[in-house]
Structure formats: structure tokens, C-alpha cells
Amino acid sequence: MSSGLWSQEKVTSPYWEERIFYLLLQECSVTDKQTQKLLKVPKGSIGQYIQDRSVGHSRIPSAKGKKNQIGLKILEQPHAVLFVDEKDVVEINEKFTELLLAITNCEERFSLFKNRNRLSKGLQIDVGCPVKVQLRSGEEKFPGVVRFRGPLLAERTVSGIFFGVELLEEGRGQGFTDGVYQGKQLFQCDEDCGVFVALDKLELIEDDDTALESDYAGPGDTMQVELPPLEINSRVSLKVGETIESGTVIFCDVLPGKESLGYFVGVDMDNPIGNWDGRFDGVQLCSFACVESTILLHINDIIPALSESVTQERRPPKLAFMSRGVGDKGSSSHNKPKATGSTSDPGNRNRSELFYTLNGSSVDSQPQSKSKNTWYIDEVAEDPAKSLTEISTDFDRSSPPLQPPPVNSLTTENRFHSLPFSLTKMPNTNGSIGHSPLSLSAQSVMEELNTAPVQESPPLAMPPGNSHGLEVGSLAEVKENPPFYGVIRWIGQPPGLNEVLAGLELEDECAGCTDGTFRGTRYFTCALKKALFVKLKSCRPDSRFASLQPVSNQIERCNSLAFGGYLSEVVEENTPPKMEKEGLEIMIGKKKGIQGHYNSCYLDSTLFCLFAFSSVLDTVLLRPKEKNDVEYYSETQELLRTEIVNPLRIYGYVCATKIMKLRKILEKVEAASGFTSEEKDPEEFLNILFHHILRVEPLLKIRSAGQKVQDCYFYQIFMEKNEKVGVPTIQQLLEWSFINSNLKFAEAPSCLIIQMPRFGKDFKLFKKIFPSLELNITDLLEDTPRQCRICGGLAMYECRECYDDPDISAGKIKQFCKTCNTQVHLHPKRLNHKYNPVSLPKDLPDWDWRHGCIPCQNMELFAVLCIETSHYVAFVKYGKDDSAWLFFDSMADRDGGQNGFNIPQVTPCPEVGEYLKMSLEDLHSLDSRRIQGCARRLLCDAYMCMYQSPTMSLYK
């Protein structure tokens, strides 16, 4: 299909606009008037009829032998004017236009358009109607009530109609809005109980409990539509594959014994298509001279052509509403007559058989070897003669498949966030459908893939200018039929090429694709047969997300239609963390952990550390509200318990929408601001949440000598750098800090959160810190029995000045029994030391501690929060083994560009265990760049280390 004119200039003065709308019946290839490059408008696009002011009508005068053309302003591209042949469009009324415009995927829009019954019922859906909503393909439909019907964004001449639905019963909590869209309250319902959807996600619950047909109706689903019979000798058109063929009506009536199916039409085609002999079930329906170009179709598959009288009128003709393309998808199992090229019963011929018949072959015959169709990929935005494939003139262009290429239908969930790709199927030499022997990447820019060994150091990627704003991480498409969709993983210019390429990662394997290599050089890494390389200028932003307008307010974006595919569950039942193998199976993978959004990594990683595999703070989730608590105490606690912690432990995933709800609550505190948008520190978050909102009993009670007990939730290590120390342990750092500040724990903590010595986020006091798996805090507790550092008896005195003495247990806190203390301080260099008595329980019998019976107070490391370049990630321990470590990043991957979505990921990192077995000397001498996997971040970027008491976790 081609057009006569394409203008990117704003359509104001040259044309009159009328409220008449048309839908394209097939993809249109057009030329940009300014750049002379080829552009495409997909099948299913909707245009508004315009008139040329200068001549009083909208048609380009036809050349000899050519038909008139209709002027359209494409609604999805409001500054574009397109002139198309009348046979390539069908008129639709304004009400249907509004319903269809809300469906952003043109292919799905076209499928719904063909289902007249379903579309007509959409007009009946109004506020108050009971409906069922399909949130995710393959899952149950949730009941609901329509609370809003209308446009979400009234920016065009005509706007798409969306339905705001309040979900009921089991659907409650499965939505993503409370009726607010971009700051406007369009209807009211409880939070997460509402959705905004287009008609294709909706089913009207009728009195007889029969719902609307499915999104892709089978061939029989629309046969009940009553259309008037066509006149004999009238001109008609029909869709064959991707082309429109014309012919003359020679028969129009019901079939004997099939009256309930409505009218069938016999057509004498202009081109040799079909071989119907005028008979059905042994009955001669009509007679004609030639049977080499005749077919029999249901009337719903026929597009009435324009009459001569109508073509002379100013207004373009009103074409038949229903245009069921014979090559389009549909059920192949319905036993209803469609078309036949022989005397066989059309009631026993399926849609695939019909496609064979229309291409001039019997169902059982081999497909034709020649075709006028071109089965290679044209380069988008360039002259069609210059294809992406750069195929030479002697390229063997096999005939197209005689069955339409299957198109992967998009799940509701995929339409929001995943990579719902459709792969173009290419014909094999025998005519069967198969993947292309060379992927688009291979055909577009190179001769052979296997000409050089894989290099590990690829050329540097470059950020070229791109008018479409595409970047690494953007969802992009290469517009073909069906299109290629992918996420851009790399952009740059390989050696020897003058073109800037984009490397896309596909979801489904495609023959000829690689695992991220191109011409033997690796540019990114993905699964085998999923890496596709194309010219960057051939890529466009993913058109399926065109209606998801950029939301300037990223806070409200969590409540927009875009996040519908990322919803997580609500779990009321209190759930302990799953440990060892069970926890590993739940937690690892992509879209696992807590989804990051808009500077939330500090909060995501902190919550994951505290609750994913530890119950030490679970009492925070259970304390009943008291009279002194803030008014939103219960709301916060319930949100944490049922929408964050419990779902994380059962399903391993929490969406950003839930975290944004918590961030909004944090901003209610007078002392807090910026929690919904700004980068924050974990300690600031913990202080607001624990102290101001939940009023958690302080985790730590610390006393400085002779002072009152100080309450806090975490401990920040302050100290001067010791150049003699290469790699300190957490044990050493904590003891140094307590000794230098003369501090003691007033009581043993159940949870100890230690903040590493830093100056701000960036400057680290030590290049590496060894996270002690076990922390002995016995010597840091007051009123606790302690062992003599020399004899092991009950210590009575402690000397801070002996701490650095290398002759006595270097690097250890020094406390001695009465006898050993006297002996130690007889040495000349210790004569002037000032030692202090150790505080002991008043009722402690001295004899109980004489023979090494003094217990130790140990704490276990359960999580480490790390930071690098202002981005927080987490390491958590899921089991007893030293290698039982998981790494969590709430923004590990990206689905789309600036207005895309973060994909959280949890990955096992058993290599951590091997490094924690190394000596401190070996770790110190080890180049950080040689540390494998995630272990480098654990050893080099630790920000907070979290310990729990194995015996006291139930009490605090």
C-alpha cells in the first residue's frame, strides 16, 4: 500500500477537517516530504478525513488507470497528512473511533474492530455496569463495576475512551489506583482497588451471565452479524494475506442447510485466485465460464467497493464496517463455512485451509514457488529500495508462506512491562514456515557471522544522537509486519562500519541471532539466539506504549496504567522467612526482591536486608496500637506487614507501588521531606520509620563512662584511620570505636546495625572491610561476667591503655583477674596505666566463674547493605553455610528508557563464602579488580552490617 503525499507540517490552513474517521486496512508505506525517507503507518491506525481547501475536496486527482485517494490526518500522529486509496480504508463512526483509539496496539485494535458484535457491546458499557476485567492474560478475570467512562487525556480532536473500574471480591487489592489518574480524581475507590483499561480488557456481565467474546474472536464468533445482501455484479474487495484483492459479485445468498450462518458471497476475482465451481454440497448455486478465479466467502469477509455515483460525491464513501481479512488470525477449529476452491463443504474448511485456497493452491498441494511479495526486511525510514538486508538483485526471494505468519498475542502483563516480542517467520525453501536462517542482525549489516573468534574487549559503545530519544534500556521496535520488539542493550559503531548500530535483546530465541556478539566481538551478554543488531536509525520507540504518556510527576506514575503489570500480592497471614533451599527457590531470579523506582534504592535495600531472611524485627509488625501512637501507625504497620514483608517472604517480590505508599507516609512526618523523590540515607529512613511513626523500642542502649544510657537504632563507627591496618574486621572496628569512646552496651541487643566508618557516601576509610560472620560482644557489655585475657578466670579489671600493647593479645580488649592485673602492671612500661574495675552483677557468686564457665554473647551477621556511586544494594544470608549468600539490586535491569520500569533481581553469590575464608593478609594483597562476581561489592562497598542475636530475636 502506498500513499501519494506525506507532510510533517502542521495541518491547519491547507485543509478542512471533518469529523469522519477511517481505519487503515493494511500497513501503509509513505514518504517523508522533507527527508524523502520511507515511513510506515501500521494497519489499524485511525485517521480523520480532511478536505483540500484549494480544490474543495480531499482527493488527489487520479492518474490514468488509478483510483481516487482520500486525505487523512492520522490521529496517533496529529501533524501528519496521508493520502490513501479508497479501497485501503474503511469508515468507522465516531463512537467506535473513541473505543478503538484507547487500544494503543494497532494489531489488537484491528482484531477488535473486526469483531463487530464485541465492539457494539462496548457502546453499552457505562458507569454502573457490572463487568469482568482481564488484568493479566491466562489468569482469572476479576469482577468489578464501571465507575468512570471517558478520555484520560483530552488532547486530540477525538480521544480514546477508557473505563475506570472498581474491582470487587477477589479482585480487591489487585488494582493500581484509587481512582486518581495523573493527579485528577476520576472516580473513588479504596487504594489498589481500581484500574483504568480499554475495551479489549473488559467483558460486560449480562443478565444471562454471558460475557463478551475473547480478545481474538474465532471465525464463528462474528458470524451472527446480520449484513444486507450484496447486489450481483457489484464490485467488492477482500484481504488476501497482506494485500487487498478486488472482484465482482456473482452470487449472494444463504447456503442450503446453512441458513443460520447468514449470507455467503461468490466473487469472480480480477486476479487468478481460488477455484470455486459454483457448487455447494452437490447443489449448483450459480454458473459461470471460468472457475480459475472464483471464490466463496462469508459476507463478513467482503468489503463492498465504491459505486461510481458515490465516488463523484464530495464525501468519501462509507465502506462496509466489517473487514475480516482472510489471512488474519482466528480459530481454526470452527466448522463454519468460509471459502472454498473446490466442491468440498466449506463448513468443514478452516481458516488455514481458506488461506491456501485463496492463494491458488489446494489444501494438500505444495505451495507456490514464486510470488510477487517481498520477503525481506526493508529499512525503516529509508527508501524502500535500500533495505536493511542490502540484498543483491539475485537474492532468492522465496514465496511467502501460504499460512499467515503467527503473531504472538500480548498478555496483559506483558503489555505493561515485559518483552512481548513477535518474530517474523520466513519461508523455507519448501514453503513451510520457519525462522529466518539469518536473523535481522546478520542480514542487515554483515556478510557472515562466523568470520572471527569472539573478542572479550569490544569497541567502546558510543552515545550517538538520536531524534527518537532512544538509549540503552529503551524499549524499541523495528517496524515490520509483524514488528520486531526488543530492549536496547548496546549502541555504538563497530569497526569497519559507517552505521551506528543498536543491539537489541529479544525474549524468544530466533535462528541466526547471537548471545550478544557481532562479527566475533561481544557487545553485551544475553541468552543464545536472542541478540539482534540493527541500524539505530531503523529503530523506533515501542509504539505499543504510545498512550502511556510521560508522567512528569514520578510519584503519581506508580498509580498510572503503566505499573499495572508490576503488581504484587497482599498477604494477611503472618509469614516467617523461608530459609535454606526453600527460601532460595522463592527469592532468586529477575523480578524478585523489591522493585526500585525514582531514587528508592536506599529504602528497597534496607527493607530487604531487615526482613527477607530475618525475623529479628518482626515484633515491629505486630505491636498493637497504643493511645500515644500517631494516627497513621496502623496504616503503616499494616502496609509493612501485609503488602511488603509477607509478600516478599512468600512470593519473593514487592512492586514499587507498595514502596511508594510507604514513602508517602514517611513524608507526613514534620521532620521529614523528600522521601518520595530524593535520594536519602538508610539511617534517615530508619530513624523516621522506627522513631517517629512506629515508636519502636530503641534497639541499642549504650552508656558512656559515668553518663546516662543513650538510646539509638544503629551505631555509627567513628575513628581515625590506622595506616598499620590493611583489612580490618567488623569485630576490630566495633571494639576500637567502643574503647576510644569509652562506651559499653547497657544491655545485650537483639539486633545490632553497624554503620561503617566513612566520610559521606563516597569516601571510605578502608578499601576493604572484612564482615565478621560472628560478632562477640561479651567484652562490650556492662554488668556481664568476662574472661581474664591471660588465665581465663573471672575478670575484675579492664585497662584501656593496654589495648594497643602488642605483647598481650594484640588487638583485643584487655581485662584481667585480680592476680593477672597485678602482674601485668608490674612491667615498667605499664606502671602508669590507669585501669578500672569491671562492672559485674551484684549477686554473682565468685566461685561459679573460676573454671572457664563464662558464656559468650555472640551475634550472627544476617545482612550487609552496600553503596557504590550513590546506589544501594544488599547482601543477605539465607542459610547457615558460609556460601549461603544472595545479592539483591532493586534496579538491576531496565524495561524501557526514561519512562520505563526498573526490574529488581536477586542472584546467588556463593563466591562470597570463599573470600570470607581467606586470611586478612591475603585479602589485603588481593587486587580489588580481581575479586570475582558480587563479592567485590561486599568487601569494598559495605555501608551497614546487620547482626542478630540467635537467642534474643523473639524479645525485641
UniProtKB/Swiss-Prot annotation:
It catalyses: Thiol-dependent hydrolysis of ester, thioester, amide, peptide and isopeptide bonds formed by the C-terminal Gly of ubiquitin (a 76-residue protein attached to proteins as an intracellular targeting signal). Zn(2+) 1 binds at residues 788, 791, 817, 820. Changing residue 441 to E: Abolishes deubiquitination of TRAF2. Changing residue 871 to N: Loss of deubiquitinating activity. Residues 106-593 are annotated as: Interaction with TRIP. Changing residue 418 to E: Abolishes deubiquitination of TRAF2. Zn(2+) 2 binds at residues 799, 802, 825, 833. Residues 309-353, 392-411 are annotated as: Disordered. Residues 592-950 form the USP domain. Residues 470-554 are annotated as: Interaction with IKBKG/NEMO. Ubiquitinated. Polyubiquitinated in hepatocytes treated with palmitic acid. Ubiquitination is mediated by E3 ligase TRIM47 and leads to proteasomal degradation. Phosphorylated on several serine residues by IKKA and/or IKKB in response to immune stimuli. Phosphorylation requires IKBKG. Phosphorylation abolishes TRAF2 deubiquitination, interferes with the activation of Jun kinases, and strongly reduces CD40-dependent gene activation by NF-kappa-B. Changing residue 436 to E: Abolishes deubiquitination of TRAF2. Changing residue 719 to V: In FTDALS8; increased K63-deubiquitinase activity; increased inhibition of NF-kappa-B; no impact on interaction with TBK1, OPTN and SQSTM. InterPro entries: CAP-Gly_dom_sf, CAP-Gly_domain, Papain-like_cys_pep_sf, Peptidase_C19_UCH, USP_CS, USP_dom. It is found in: Cytoplasm; Cytoplasm, Perinuclear region; Cytoplasm, Cytoskeleton; Cell membrane. Residues 153-198, 253-286, 492-535 form the CAP-Gly domain. Changing residue 441 to A: Loss of phosphorylation. Its EC number is 3.4.19.12. One of its GO terms (biological process) is proteolysis. Belongs to the peptidase C19 family. Deubiquitinase that specifically cleaves 'Lys-63'- and linear 'Met-1'-linked polyubiquitin chains and is involved in NF-kappa-B activation and TNF-alpha-induced necroptosis. Negatively regulates NF-kappa-B activation by deubiquitinating upstream signaling factors. Contributes to the regulation of cell survival, proliferation and differentiation via its effects on NF-kappa-B activation. Negative regulator of Wnt signaling. Inhibits HDAC6 and thereby promotes acetylation of alpha-tubulin and stabilization of microtubules. Interacts (via CAP-Gly domain) with IKBKG/NEMO (via proline-rich C-terminal region). Interacts with TRAF2 and TRIP. Interacts with PLK1, DVL1, DVL3, MAVS, TBK1, IKKE and RIGI. Interacts (via CAP-Gly domain) with microtubules. Interacts with HDAC6 and BCL3. Interacts with MAP3K7. Identified in a complex with TRAF6 and SQSTM1. Interacts with OPTN and SQSTM1. Interacts with CEP350. Interacts with RNF31; the interaction is indirect and is mediated via SPATA2. This is Ubiquitin carboxyl-terminal hydrolase CYLD. The lineage of its organism: Eukaryota, Metazoa, Chordata, Craniata, Vertebrata.
